[in-house]
Amino acid sequence: MPLSKVEHYLSYHTRLLLPHVLSLQSSHRVAYIFSLLSAVSTGFITLISLYSQPWQKHLNYSSWQINTIASMTNLGMYLTPPILGMIADSHGPITLSLLAIIGFIPSYSYLAYVFNHPELSLGGNGDSSFNLSIICFVFIGISTSALYFSALLTCTKLYPHTKLLSISLPTTCYGISSVVGSQLLRIKWFWSSNASSSSSNSDLNLGRVFQTFALVYVVIGLLAWIATSVVSLLHFNEEQDNQKRLDDQTDVEQSPLLERSNHVQEKFTQTMLRIFSDPVTYILAVSILLSLGPLEMFIANMGSLTNLLVQLDAPTLSTKLLSTYALSSTFTRLLTGIVADFFAKKKISIKWILLTFLSLGVCAQLFLLKMTSSASPWGLVPTGSLVGIVYGGLFTVYPTLVLLVWGERSFGTVYGSLLIAPAIGSMIFCMLYAKFYDSRCMSGGGDLRNPSCISAVYKYSSIAFVVSAVLSAVVFWKLKSRKLRI
């Protein structure tokens, strides 16, 4: 298929310039490095867990408002992959890099302006300011998925024959990004003393943070544009070669090709209808909702939970907790991929990996329940590490399971559709957390009460993980009855 008009115009000047500046091999390498840098920046969205305390102190946001922001961000991230995949297939990954630029830069610029002008949130226009902030975070969520898919597709198209370069490294870079971001925010320039407080503790200055992110994405957007233009150049050259070969063929030879193409498209449509009428698809979706929903809740409310348990020096502990979580998640993604390949060679079912991570998820929720019930912060960082292990493991096992059950051709559509489940799960559990936090954990004077006020949330999340494990077992039982060896 030739370049679409959109892809043609977006990549036109870069395609003309690149062959005069770099060789084809050098273009490959530069584009790949730029794509990895893009992937490293996509996980900055996870830093939202560090924004809770500054929002509460500086803009008087309630936990409900903060969790609304987190939920809408996740909806933007998880509801759009099927659409973004269709756009990328039709117009190339360069369109996704453009969407990311359009979404990130104005959104972060506006959020910085709102934080630097708290009167917008505290005055009569507070609702409109907050609503616009929600819209900005929806765009940031969409842009995060767009930039990540842009980087992933570019790596896949540049090195399609090696999973390490095409899948593992960009995925790992996404995991590392929250570590990079949390370390970046340790720089003193991002912190400022609260003049209205007698405490010597400093607060994160989100105005400076968001301004910095806007500038970072200007640079990253340019690098992503160059990287995706290389993919368009390769596609353009490939189409020219194919056209030359087609010109040498007769019309008689071309006719069966068209018939075969129509047959393949019809078969693909039938496969999609069969998949989305299969009960296993929906049982798996509910299992994903009940497991990833509580994990997204923990990530979004890491800062407020730390503040409940510790209160003194909570921002420092929140940063440490996020770094520990991110490192554990990144390491687990790599290790799970290696173990899954080993299991496949030894013909061991992947269900043991999935059920192990779900069991660890139950343990993590029970640890959080114990900590909040006893009002003891001991073990918070190790528990955060355990949550990172479960999160990274599940986000590696679930796509692997989809690939094994429904095949490579249907993978993008099926897995992209299943990502709606964690978006809904995140919204449900984040709103549950916010409801308990605002109604039980805040006194009339705005002071925090005993951490046990939030413990009921982790009872529900523990039950959710148990039900998720049971549903996963049902999925494997149904697949086994169909004689599918996974």
From Swiss-Prot:
Q: Which CDD domains match?
A: MFS_MCT_like
Show the SUPFAM superfamilies listed in the entry. MFS general substrate transporter
Q: Kindly name one Pfam family recorded for this protein.
A: MFS_1
Q: This protein's superkingdom?
A: Eukaryota
How does it sit in the bilayer? Answer: Multi-pass membrane protein
What is the predominant subcellular site recorded for this chain?
A: membrane
- GO CC field: fungal-type vacuole membrane
Keywords, comma-separated and alphabetical:
Glycoprotein, Membrane, Phosphoprotein, Transmembrane, Transmembrane helix, Transport, Vacuole
Topological domain ranges for the Cytoplasmic compartment: 1-29, 89-93, 155-163, 234-279, 344-347, 407-413, 478-486
Q: Which GO MF terms are attached to this record?
A: transmembrane transporter activity
Q: Which residues lie on this side of the membrane: Vacuolar?
A: 51-67, 115-133, 185-212, 301-320, 369-385, 435-456
- Which regions span the lipid bilayer? 30-50, 68-88, 94-114, 134-154, 164-184, 213-233, 280-300, 321-343, 348-368, 386-406, 414-434, 457-477
Write down the glycosylated positions.
Answer: N60, N131, N194
Q: Where in the cell is it found?
A: Vacuole membrane
Q: Which residues carry this modification: Phosphoserine?
A: S255
Query: To which protein family does this belong?
Result: Belongs to the major facilitator superfamily.
PANTHER family of this UniProt entry? TRANSPORTER MCH1-RELATED, UNCHARACTERIZED NODULIN-LIKE PROTEIN
Describe the task this protein carries out: Probable transporter. Does not act in the transport of monocarboxylic acids across the plasma membrane.
- Name recorded for this polypeptide: Probable transporter MCH1
List the source organism: Saccharomyces cerevisiae (strain ATCC 204508 / S288c)
Quote the gene name from the UniProt entry.
Answer: MCH1
